[in-house]
């Protein structure tokens, strides 16, 4: 059940972020909910990859997704842990990008 809810939440985030105008968007579920080890208390680990983040610092990126993040929390009554990447950052060999790729099961 935890995986189904998380996948619904990812779809919700993706739809809302597209409506908000984020370009070249990928929303990737990772962590325990992606790998099947989640409990009902687990958060939803999500990576958002978008070219709209290009040239933006962490705080600007957070502002860009803030309203959608709040909507998702209210809709699913779950905590979300969100990491944000440009496509180039996500495809890089950085520790955080490698972690997300591994924890997504890909």
Predicted regions and their residues:
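Short beta-strand->loop micro-motif that forms the acidic, two-metal-ion catalytic signature
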Residues: 45-48
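Catalytic core of pol beta-like nucleotidyltransferases
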Residues: 1-28, 35-40, 51-106
